[in-house]
Amino acid sequence: MPATAISAPKNIVLVHGGFVDGSGWQAVYQFLCKDGFAVSIVQNPINSLADDVRVTKRVIAAQSGPVILVGHSYGGVVITEAGNDPKVVGLVYIAAFAPDQGESVSSLIKDPPPGAPVPPILPPQDGYLLLDKAKFPASFAADVDLGAAEFMADSQVP
């Protein structure tokens, strides 16, 4: 079948990163819906990678047809794992981690290359991590409206 006869996937599944929920995708959601895409936003519990992959695969299963997975930050790890689903035809990483076999987010940020920004992760409290609110907009949501980035910083999910 010629490539021109294949229709582009219309299902896009957005996967948020750590520290936030799916509401950070609102502007992207509106833009894609306006262009005629069927967009779903995963609300991962951020308890474990296995749980997040399971929730993402549940959203993939609910789609009628091929799916493009889009992940931001830690969401890249999730889409890497969930991307082996037969419905998934593409992965899009937006400022996201794309670990190789055996790598984790921790191993990727442990020894950053010289000059690379270091995530402003605060010391754990009760076993949970948060980003420094003052540094959140520049480090996590640099291309987001400042008001939206500040809201995301104040509504972080540990």
Stretches with model-predicted labels:
Residues T56, V70, L91:
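Glycine-rich FAD cofactor-binding loop and adjacent beta-loop-alpha segment at the N-terminus
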Residues D35-F37, A62-P66, N84-V89, V157:
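Short glycine/proline-enriched coil/turn segments at helix->beta-strand junctions
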Residues A27, E81-A82:
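Active-site signature of alpha/beta-hydrolase-fold catalytic machinery across serine-
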Residues V15-G18, H72-S73, A96:
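Glycine-rich His-Gly loop
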Residues Y128-P158:
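Conserved alpha/beta-hydrolase catalytic His-Asp/Glu region
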Residues A5-G65:
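Active-site catalytic motif of lipid deacylating hydrolases and related acyltransferases
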Residues N84-K133:
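Flexible "cap/lid" loop of the alpha/beta hydrolase fold
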Residues V70-G75, I79:
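Gly/Ala-rich beta-loop-alpha elbow adjacent to hydrolase catalytic centers
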